[in-house]
């Protein structure tokens, strides 16, 4: 079960309450505790969280016009933000050249894939990045990172038959001395964990990295604190990256546990694709978990792909025709899985788009391009003129069935609804 699923039932229950007295408050407090424990948040943090939230609900008066149940959701939101790391979104700003980043983590944490994700993230923002593999224990690590580096177009340094991880790291940094950022991947857990920690400490002393990232698998939940503290005994941990946040309810526990250690969660991995990686923003993350949507993130994604001002204006104004849709078919692929885009929408809208429709839209972009290319300009600008005979003609020209054309039009209608929702939400935010 995902973290958002754990909390969606809780939010439904809160919004189903007509009024909040002490008995209702106590019942909701227990529900909140159960939800947090399901998310694998440490027990002492659960107690502190509920005590603080209940105290605020008892003592604070909702602003005029805000129903108590909505204010309760707001308090829950605010307290979750505090629990998971505070107000400020994370930043990554290299301060020198090359800026050396050292990645640490136990075996299976997703560290090597994360090295490539971080490299892709930085390369997309204009940084020249080099990847260095120092794992001499796991032979596949060299090939894995080399292949990922080639896939994302980033230079790679490693020594397939190398025996000394420290020397490989030093040579790698020297090899990439003209890069903006050098990312060093290290070995995961050895049979002897103490040997692993000694090795990463030796690499740290040799290359003197500017930032040390600990990579933690979200599925470990509250045990994330123990992992962080074990590494902290040997060397400073400046930042944390939590992977697999899309696939487990324990992600909240991992975030809370890390925040408790004083380490800063800087990035989260939200899927398997190399593009599914983002700076951690506690407010945006909690908004998604509570089903409030994250329209800022949606707009940011749209801007990154739809660079043309006209297209963006059409999306924001709620206008979207098939001509715009046709121009952006190729760009849609750059968004990554469309399921991620729909997850950024408020839950009361996103749930209306089925997984089957999203999967269909991901698989059939090329087919749709052929369909759209078979339409006249009138049909592209005015989809309402499409009748059965026109659809048959379009299908024949595109080499598909009329059913394929209708399925594409269904997805297009969902896109139109999304743009209208975006427009309404933006108006609300401007008030």
Curated annotation (Swiss-Prot):
Picking any one GO biological process from the record gives: SRP-dependent cotranslational protein targeting to membrane
Report the domain remarks.
Answer: Composed of three domains: the N-terminal N domain, which is responsible for interactions with the ribosome, the central G domain, which binds GTP, and the C-terminal M domain, which binds the RNA and the signal sequence of the RNC.
Q: Which SUPFAM superfamilies match?
A: Domain of the SRP/SRP receptor G-proteins, P-loop containing nucleoside triphosphate hydrolases, Signal peptide-binding domain
> EC number(s) on record?
3.6.5.4
The protein's name is Signal recognition particle 54 kDa protein
Q: Which UniProt keywords apply?
A: Cytoplasm, GTP-binding, Hydrolase, Nucleotide-binding, Ribonucleoprotein, RNA-binding, Signal recognition particle
Task: Write down the SMART domains for this protein, in alphabetical order.
Answer: AAA, SRP54, SRP54_N
Subcellular location per the Swiss-Prot or TrEMBL entry: Cytoplasm
